[in-house]
Design a protein with these regions (language model features):
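Catalytic cores of carbohydrate-active enzymes across secretory and cytosolic contexts
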Residues: 1-172
Length: 172
């Protein structure tokens, strides 16, 4: 996390040396998702190690009494990743005019199909065995519904269309 920045700065006494070692992934390009915390509170928690507060404000380019975690990470990183092209564009629009930030590029979160794809589903799909494919999907759905029941006590029928949303909704 962010204390790593100050630990590295304490060690090397150079923002440039910290930048050589730090890459940041920005996950939330909406204002509400980026923590801004009182410097005094962080100092009382020894967040900055042995650095005096005046030096922290100077190296982070912080004006006022609040530290923006994301902006600090962007200023101390050699590069930042947005987790998609859209995310990169929104993050660049959001932070791009700030002084001293690193470039923000896009990366795509990798998916390992061999790990995440069921062997039998893949086999039945590739051999066009639709009946076996449907049967296997129902077996896997029942496994999932059993897990849901074990964790929540809620029972669902595998023969009923069940729609779930497992991703947070973003503003961009």
């Amino acid at each position: 996390g962010l204390p790593l920045i100050f630990s590295l700065y304490n060690k090397f006494k150079s923002v440039e040396e910290v930048r050589k070692r730090l890459v940041f992934t920005t996950h939330t390009p909406v204002k509400a998702g980026n923590d801004i915390v009182p410097l005094k509170l962080l100092d009382e928690m020894n967040f900055f190690g042995s650095l005096p507060l005046a030096e922290v404000k100077d190296i982070t380019k912080t004006e006022g009494d609040l530290l923006n975690y994301t902006l600090t990470a962007l200023r101390f990183s050699k590069i930042a990743n947005g987790v998609s092209k859209i995310h990169q564009g929104v993050a660049t629009q959001m932070w791009g005019n700030e002084e001293g930030i690193c470039p923000i590029v896009s990366i795509t979160n990798a998916q390992n199909a061999n790990y995440w794809t069921d062997h039998y589903l893949k086999k039945h799909l590739s051999t066009n065995q639709i009946d076996l494919l449907i049967e296997r999907k129902k077996e896997l759905k029942q496994e999932l519904l059993n897990e849901v029941a074990n964790q929540t006590g809620k029972l669902f029928d595998k023969n009923v269309l069940t729609i779930v949303w497992a991703r947070r909704v973003t503003a961009y």
